[in-house]
C-alpha cells in the first residue's frame, strides 16, 4: 500500500527523501500544482505525511481517514539528540541562530525547522543538540511535546487567518511550555547556560540577513518585519540606532493579515508607502507625513533628491503580498535598489 505526501514545499520534499531512503512507495499531492492533483482517494493510502502549512480543517479531515505524520513527530520519534524548541511571534530565527553558534563552539548541533532546514534531513546525523525553530503551524499539528527544552520568546497577534483568533494562536504557541523544561528567556548566553550548565563568551555572534540589518550608517533593512509587533520593535530600536536623529520609514506589503487594523506611528519623520497594497496601507497608518509611491525605486529617488542625508528604516510591518515571493526576496531587492539608486 502506498503512502501520500500532502504538500510539496520544503517539508514535502524532505518527506520524499525520507520515504525514498526507507524504500516506501508514495504519491504526492499539492493543491497549488495541477500535475500533483491526480491521486487515489485519500483513504486508500496507508499513511499520509503532511506539511505544516496546510489548513487545520484539511489536516483534521485527513486524520479521520488515515494515520497522519508530521516532520516534528517523526523527528521526536527517531532522533536521539537533545532537542531545544524555540518559538515566538518575532526573533525566533535570530535567537535559534545565535544559540546554535554558541553551542557549536563545544558541541555538535543541528539548526533546523522553520528556519529553512528540514528536520528529516538531520535525523541521527551525530549531532548532540538540535536547535529547532518551530512555528505555530507545527505546534498545532504536533502530536505531543517531546522537547527537552522549550523557549517561548513572545506572543503578539499573528497568523490569525489560520488560527481564527488571538486566543487560539496564543494557546498554540504556549504548547511549547509543556516541554521537559521551559523558559521565556531570549538572551542566547543565558539560554546556553540553561541548556548546558556552563557559561560561555563569544563577542562576534553572526546575524541573519534582513533582521534589522544595518547595510550602511544610515540605512537599516528589516524586511523580515511582517507584523505590527515586529514593526514597533524596529521603530523603538531605530531611535537609538540613528542616535535620536530623524528617520523615515519605508513600508509595503499586504495588511489583510493584520485585518487592516489602524496604527498610529510617532517615531518616523515621514512614512513612505509603495507597492500594490499601498492604498490599503495608507488607510491603516495614521501619520501626518505619509506619501504614496508606485514602486521602491521611486521611494529611493525621492529620498536621494533631499538636500540632507536621510536615515532610512525599511521595516514593512506586513507580509509581502503581491509584491514579492517572501521577505527574503523583498530584502534582497531592497539592497539591490539601494545600490542602484545611491551608488550607481
Annotate the PLM regions.
Residues 126-186, 322-328:
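Flexible active-site lid/hinge loop adjacent to a nucleotide/diphosphate
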Residues 19, 48, 86, 114, ...:
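Residue-level signal for inorganic ion chemistry
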Amino acid at each position: 500500500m502506498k503512502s501520500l505526501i500532502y504538500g510539496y514545499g520544503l517539508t514535502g520534499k524532505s518527506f520524499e527523501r525520507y520515504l525514498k531512503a526507507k524504500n516506501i512507495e508514495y504519491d504526492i499531492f499539492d493543491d497549488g500544482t495541477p500535475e500533483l492533483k491526480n491521486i487515489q482517494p485519500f483513504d486508500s493510502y496507508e499513511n499520509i505525511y503532511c506539511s505544516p502549512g496546510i489548513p487545520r480543517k484539511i489536516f483534521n479531515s485527513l486524520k479521520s481517514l488515515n494515520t497522519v505524520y508530521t516532520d516534528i513527530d517523526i523527528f521526536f520519534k527517531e532522533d536521539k539528540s537533545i532537542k531545544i524548541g524555540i518559538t515566538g511571534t518575532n526573533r525566533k530565527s535570530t535567537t535559534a541562530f545565535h544559540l546554535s553558534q554558541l553551542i557549536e563552539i563545544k558541541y555538535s548541533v543541528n539548526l533546523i525547522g522553520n528556519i529553512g532546514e528540514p528536520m528529516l534531513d538531520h535525523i541521527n546525523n551525530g549531532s548532540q543538540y538540535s536547535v529547532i525553530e518551530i512555528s505555530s503551524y507545527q505546534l498545532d499539528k504536533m502530536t505531543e511535546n517531546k522537547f527537552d527544552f522549550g523557549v517561548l520568546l513572545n506572543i503578539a497577534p499573528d497568523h490569525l487567518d489560520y488560527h481564527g483568533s488571538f486566543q487560539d494562536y496564543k494557546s498554540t504557541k504556549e504548547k511549547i511550555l509543556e516541554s521537559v523544561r521551559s523558559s521565556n528567556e531570549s538572551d542566547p548566553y543565558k539560554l546556553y547556560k540553561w541548556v548546558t550548565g556552563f557559561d560561555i563568551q563569544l563577542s562576534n555572534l553572526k546575524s541573519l540577513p534582513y533582521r534589522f540589518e544595518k547595510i550602511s550608517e544610515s540605512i537599516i533593512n528589516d524586511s523580515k518585519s511582517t507584523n505590527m509587533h515586529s514593526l514597533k520593535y524596529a521603530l523603538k530600536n531605530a531611535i537609538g540606532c540613528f542616535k535620536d536623529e530623524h528617520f523615515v520609514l519605508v513600508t509595503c506589503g499586504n495588511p489583510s493579515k493584520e485585518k487592516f487594523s489602524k496604527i498610529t506611528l510617532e517615531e518616523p519623520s515621514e512614512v513612505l508607502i509603495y507597492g500594490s497594497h499601498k492604498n490599503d496601507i495608507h488607510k491603516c497608518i495614521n501619520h501626518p507625513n505619509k506619501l504614496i509611491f508606485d514602486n521602491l525605486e521611486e521611494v529611493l529617488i525621492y529620498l536621494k533628491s533631499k538636500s540632507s542625508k536621510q536615515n532610512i528604516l525599511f521595516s514593512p510591518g506586513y507580509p509581502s503580498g503581491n509584491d514579492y515571493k517572501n521577505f527574503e526576496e523583498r530584502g534582497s531587492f531592497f539592497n539591490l535598489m539601494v545600490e542602484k539608486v545611491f551608488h550607481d
